């Protein structure tokens, strides 16, 4: 089967599940219902509303919405609600771009960042590699308030590129938005195009992800879940524009945050990840379907870190819960989003919420995510070790 036709078949499988068919036989429908009931119990406590999507490599077994949009919008959420993905951008967008560029022999994981980005200057930075950036072991600080320190995108990027290292590369794990911003520039230098344009052409359109993008248009606003009252930067309720302040300073476009998407679109993406080695995997990858496994395998850099390349893997007190396999991989987003995939069980778990509405002080999502993951794993009837 030709790659394009193979993916059409995959997309039709998605459409079938979206039409409201009963769950696939390998999922216990009663247990899936318990996932939805649990999420309903968390409405107006952990979040105003949520969308959950569960499935395997070729079908969606559960797609449900609970709750409402927010304080000033009592309309019920729907499965087509658009969410600010926050740091899911790092894996859905930035990491996927890196996978494609490695596949095309345009990006070397162990090459110094300076090979691609000479502007990345400072003591010790010549030793920072692409792998360091992807594993959050570059030595860069976690964050700095670019939205306060600079007035333009260009000035913000220059400040990131010249930020001193805190530690020797590879010596410490520290989750770093700054590292992701540097890696965004690497992708843009290689592709000679802005990352939003590259991802739209190279990833989202080929996968049929029609509601995944940066800078959502005004006409989408009523479908977008509101996030937070921004008291630090823009001084208004944020809806339809990126929640992350630094991404706001960068014009709404960055590899560390900025993407908006829906449950059905992310399910399409998850199915592509779980389909590696099948004809549909070649929709994006030319020669190396094993690259997804490489990027989603724990790197042990530095020793003891749970990080894969871009992705995270299960660890103690992880948002993945306690029942996914050791080969699972996933990520979370500050706004209340998460995605976990378990290739051993042929399973994906997507949870999208706007838990920061109206304030980020609500952290109950930290208990909701692992409980949802455990409930979903319990619903898989053909359990594998």
Segment roles from a protein language model:
Residues 1-4:
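Positively charged n-region of N-terminal signal peptides that target proteins for export
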Residues 25-85, 106-108, 155-158, 162, ...:
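Short, conserved catalytic-motif segment at the N-terminal edge
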Residues 41-53, 72-132, 165-179, 254-257:
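Short active-site loop at a secondary-structure junction
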Residues 68-70, 123-328:
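Short, surface-exposed loop or secondary-structure junction motifs
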């Amino acid at each position: 089967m030709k790659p394009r036709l193979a993916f059409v078949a995959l997309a039709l499988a998605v459409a079938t599940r979206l039409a409201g068919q009963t769950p696939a036989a390998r999922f216990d429908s009663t247990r899936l219902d318990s996932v939805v009931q649990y999420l309903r119990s968390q409405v107006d406590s952990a979040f105003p509303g949520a969308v959950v999507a569960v499935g395997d490599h070729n079908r969606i077994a559960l797609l449900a919405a609970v709750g409402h949009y927010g304080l000033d919008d009592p309309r019920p959420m729907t499965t087509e609600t658009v969410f600010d993905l926050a740091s899911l951008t790092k894996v859905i967008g930035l990491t996927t771009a890196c996978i494609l560029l490695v596949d095309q022999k345009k990006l070397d994981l162990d090459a110094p960042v300076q090979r691609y980005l000479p502007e990345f200057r400072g003591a010790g930075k010549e030793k920072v590699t692409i792998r360091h950036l992807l594993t959050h072991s570059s030595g860069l600080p976690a964050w700095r308030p670019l939205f306060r320190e600079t007035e333009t995108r260009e000035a913000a990027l220059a400040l990131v590129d010249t930020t001193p290292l805190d530690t020797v590369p590879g010596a410490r794990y520290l989750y770093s938005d700054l590292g992701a911003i540097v890696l965004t520039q690497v992708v843009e230098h290689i592709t000679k195009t802005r990352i939003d344009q590259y991802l739209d052409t190279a990833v989202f359109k080929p996968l049929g992800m029609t509601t995944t993008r940066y800078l959502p248009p005004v006409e989408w606003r009523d479908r977008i879940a509101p996030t937070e009252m921004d008291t630090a930067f823009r001084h208004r309720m944020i809806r339809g524009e990126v929640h992350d302040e630094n991404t706001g300073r960068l014009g709404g476009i960055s590899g560390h945050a900025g993407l908006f998407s829906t449950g059905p679109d992310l399910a399409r993406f998850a199915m592509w990840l779980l389909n590696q080695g099948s004809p549909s995997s070649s929709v994006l990858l030319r020669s190396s379907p094993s690259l997804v496994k490489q990027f989603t395998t724990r790197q042990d850099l530095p020793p003891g870190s749970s990080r894969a390349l871009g992705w995270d893997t299960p660890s103690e007190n992880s948002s993945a819960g306690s029942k996914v396999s050791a080969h699972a991989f996933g990520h979370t987003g500050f706004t209340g989003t998460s995605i976990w995939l378990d290739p051993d069980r042929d399973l994906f778990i997507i949870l999208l919420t706007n838990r920061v509405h109206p304030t980020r002080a609500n952290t109950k999502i930290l208990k909701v995510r692992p409980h949802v993951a455990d409930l979903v794993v319990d619903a898989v009837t053909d359990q594998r070790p």
